[in-house]
Amino acid sequence: MKILVDENMPYADQLFQQLGDVQAIPGRPVPEGVLDHADAFMVRSVTKVNEELLKGRAVKFIGTATAGTDHVDQSWLSQAGIGFSAAPGCNAIAVVEYVFSALMLLAERDNFELKDKVVGIVGVGNVGSRLAERLAVLGIRTLLCDPPRADRGDAGEFWSLEKLVKEADILTFHTPLNKSGPYKTHHLVDVELLSVLPDNRILINASRGEVIDNQALLTALKCGKKLRVVLDVWEPEPDLSLPLLELVDIGTPHIAGYTLEGKARGTTQVFEAYCEFLGQPRKVALSDLLPEPDFSRVTLHGNVTQSTLKRLMHLVYDVRRDDTPLRQVAGQKGQFDYLRKNYLERREWSSLTVCCDNRESAELLAALGFSTELI
């Protein structure tokens, strides 16, 4: 059995070699001829999986080690009798921690307290729901917008996007990309929405680039619209708009979900799904794969303040480490993908144990996702 895996899937060799011969390949572009005799192909979001890629091939299973699936033509796979699995929620914690890292940086730059802001979350799936939970731990008011969940009658109060725009100080987008239908998210942020969005708001997109009309956003910023903007995703990728990058406050190369833990979850989820597909069910413990972090313990005395939180969060991950390299190489052919392919190891807050002399601090940090000990 021949199994192809994206070269940026950690632990793929270690896991999939239990099932057959494994070959790691670039996801964009897919090398000519490699699919000719493959039985399965494990991809990430850079690979467009469709009839053009797979017609006439022997591939019987596609796994994407990502939560998003808009790069996969699932309808065609089903018609062709090809098995498919994604990894929902695998990088949700990573994206939440990316958003916090960005917000802490902006709060320091603009001298505001997050607890005084209202956060509007658009898309309350794996990422949005976890973000809401962690904001609630800090006593920060959140407004939720998720039309599909609202129409299903899910528990909770859901706001329309129109009302959210008027009420929220911070708008953060965590939707899938739907190009049509009743829940279309393509260009959810367009000329019209930007025209009614009050000045001095924070706009964050860590979902899919096309959720925001990048040209409309560029025009608004050029015309003096006063916004703080954080973009991890772009329209298009990898050839993002250089003028837009120059005007946003934080710009990164689609890496919000790129923690080692998140990538490992994605790999293990598609591995387990492929094992099920083969009729050989297996389970993998993430803790058996992950290495000890280089820096794993810190001591905290006293209560947790926003300044303390910023230091702890940025000790694990400071978003500036990804903003600066992108600005240095943007516009150079292949560099967007190079930054993603050669991404420096990044861990999640849970990799850091905070030793506290205060039970209240330990409980708060644990609720946020840090590992804690009382001293």
Curated annotation (Swiss-Prot):
Keyword annotations from UniProtKB, A to Z: Cytoplasm, NAD, Oxidoreductase, Pyridoxine biosynthesis
Major site of localization recorded for this protein: cytoplasm
Pathway assigned in UniProt: Cofactor biosynthesis; pyridoxine 5'-phosphate biosynthesis; pyridoxine 5'-phosphate from D-erythrose 4-phosphate: step 2/5
Binding site for NAD(+): 146, 175, 206-208, 232, 257
PROSITE patterns to which the protein is assigned, alphabetical: D_2_HYDROXYACID_DH_1 (PS00065), D_2_HYDROXYACID_DH_3 (PS00671)
GO CC list: cytosol
Residues where substrate binds: 45, 66, 258
EC category name: oxidoreductase
One family name in Pfam for this protein: DUF3410
Keyword Lipoprotein applies: no
Highest taxon listed in the record's lineage: Bacteria
Protein name: Erythronate-4-phosphate dehydrogenase
Native source species: Photorhabdus laumondii subsp. laumondii (strain DSM 15139 / CIP 105565 / TT01) (Photorhabdus luminescens subsp. laumondii)
Gene of this entry: pdxB
